[in-house]
Amino acid sequence: MAANLNHIVLVDDNETTSFLNNRLLGRLAVANQVSTFARADEAFEQLWGEQDSNGRPPAPDLVFVDLKMPGVSGFEFLELYNALPQPVQEQTVMAVLTTSMHGADTARVAQYPNVEYLTKPLTEEKLQRLLSKRFDLKLNLTPTK
């Protein structure tokens, strides 16, 4: 891939899922930096919390968030994100990455403009579709033997 994203964030309380997703993103060299959070509230605070803009790192290009997590759920994370000013939201592509294919969950996520919905596991093909759609990027996928 010629161009990388600068920063991808994974928000998932499942350590194995986070490890595998991090490994996939690293193997494909999709981003210069990948950050992982097990708690949605910590991720939101770190990314968009109450601090002056000079002390905050640049917004990530892409955030994958699980829906079902203890504490602040993925839905609550989306609510917090949706309350951010529009120019702030436009800096980051938000993608739900979940095992849920329940109609109520997909309908609820569909209420948020510009939020992508992907089912686990994250694969090269799903990532390629997302990158093509939202970033006009193409992975150099090589067949595995």
Q: Where are the language model's segments positioned?
A:
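Non-catalytic signal-transmission and effector/linker regions of two-component phosphorelay proteins
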Residues: 1-9, 15-30, 55, 88-91, ...
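Receiver (REC) domain active-site loop signature in two-component systems and cognate sites
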Residues: 69
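Alpha4 helix (beta4-alpha4-beta5 surface) of REC/receiver domains from two-component response regulators
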Residues: 3, 76, 89-95, 100-118
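C-terminal compact regulatory domains
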Residues: 18, 39, 98-101
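Active-site residues of response regulator receiver
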Residues: 66
